[in-house]
Design a protein with these regions (language model features):
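Long, charged N-terminal interaction/targeting segments
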Residues: 1-63
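Short cysteine-rich clusters marking metal-coordination/redox-active sites
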Residues: 73-76, 90-93
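STAS-like cytosolic regulatory interaction modules
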Residues: 65-67, 75-76
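Flexible glycine-/small-residue-rich
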Residues: 33, 66, 110
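Cys/His-rich microdomains that often coordinate metals
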Residues: 79-80, 97
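Intrinsically disordered, low-complexity, mixed-charge
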Residues: 1, 77-78
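Short metal-coordination and nucleic-acid-contact micro-motifs, chiefly zinc-binding Cys/His arrays
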Residues: 66-69, 86, 104
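Short microdomains enriched in Cys/His and/or Lys/Arg
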Residues: 92-113
Length: 113
């Protein structure tokens, strides 16, 4: 379960952000997770509860914002949903796309104290 290592990194980084701001305990952490990032949100929530114990995030909640995978077709300038499993074929012109615009994100976007 690689979500545990991801959750541990989130706890460490959120704690560093809070300390840098001179804050104590963290009440919530918001993360953006792309549809193709390979992260299961439920598993990440569970792992976060384990990783936060004994830290400044012990009572913090994790807010996961899921980002849909979107591709861009250079042939017809269409942006389209890739879906899961991913399908990189333009529904408008029926050609393959080679540009993924979103869906691989895994980033902390907010830390509330």
């Amino acid at each position: 379960m690689h979500e545990l290592s991801i959750a541990t990194a989130i706890v460490e980084q959120a704690g560093e952000i809070a300390r840098a701001d001179g804050a104590g305990d963290v009440s919530s952490v918001t993360v953006r997770v792309g549809e193709l990032a390979g992260v299961v949100p439920d598993a990440l929530h569970f792992a976060f509860e384990v990783a936060r114990d004994g830290t400044a995030l012990a009572a913090a909640r994790l807010v996961v914002e899921q980002v849909p995978a979107q591709a861009w077709c250079g042939e017809c300038a269409e942006e389209f949903a890739v879906g899961m499993p991913p399908f990189f074929w333009c529904p408008r012109c029926d050609r393959p796309s080679q540009e993924l615009r979103s869906g691989r994100e895994l980033e902390i976007t907010g830390v509330e104290t």
